């Protein structure tokens, strides 16, 4: 299984276009040693030719341009994208579909709840109908694994996660299973397993057991501290309120990952305020000490 990190930042990317927090300002003036990052999206393949896009970020055009296999050049109009999985209906993970309209129809896998949000509050399925058939919906059942014809050697298992529906959702304050999912992706030939959850608000005992059965954990790295937005002076909401488990503090992501010594551990969906973006920060050094990696655009993983 081939996993390509197309984008590794949270919403807004890094540096965020309108932000002058210490990270964004430091990156621009050269005082901060860090890498620019686009908004979170990955691609998965069983052969390196046909790819399943997991979430369609607003930065999708630049991401595809930066990864040569996404334009195999086999025909006058072509793409390496064979299917799309949407793990939630957040703007940061779905608006890239608008930039992919020239390639419609696209086969899209998502849950009932995500499909409802994207047919009502943010009606992408309706909007794109006029583009050569638009988006063909394939339902993700929460209690069953599924395969995708273009990558038959991969088995996808959805994991309902506790998180918040987007503000435009009809059930914004009434969470439902399927608002947000993680994925277990298993290569049926090698047995390699990827656990992917860029939006992870809570890890309970059953989920921890599932993570322990995976080879690589690609997990929510949004914030270092739960009150990071307040500390940086750029917001009032906590990470938990937004459905993200912070790395630091009792019961935080680092405590969770400490219980999984055998797995490869990679943080993704990193907010522009997170001090781990600073490669010289104490927080980044703590990750190195704990053998936890920070995803970057262009990172490749093979399982």
Swiss-Prot record:
Keyword Transport in record: yes
Record key words, sorted: PQQ biosynthesis, Transport
Keyword Transport in record: yes
Gene this chain is encoded by: pqqB
Protein name: Coenzyme PQQ synthesis protein B
Pfam entry (one): Lactamase_B_2
Taxonomy, superkingdom: Bacteria
Function: May be involved in the transport of PQQ or its precursor to the periplasm.
Xref: InterPro entries: Metallo-B-lactamas, PQQ_synth_PqqB, RibonucZ/Hydroxyglut_hydro
GO BP terms, alphabetized: pyrroloquinoline quinone biosynthetic process
Pathway the protein contributes to: Cofactor biosynthesis; pyrroloquinoline quinone biosynthesis
HAMAP family assigned: PQQ_syn_PqqB
Family note: Belongs to the PqqB family.
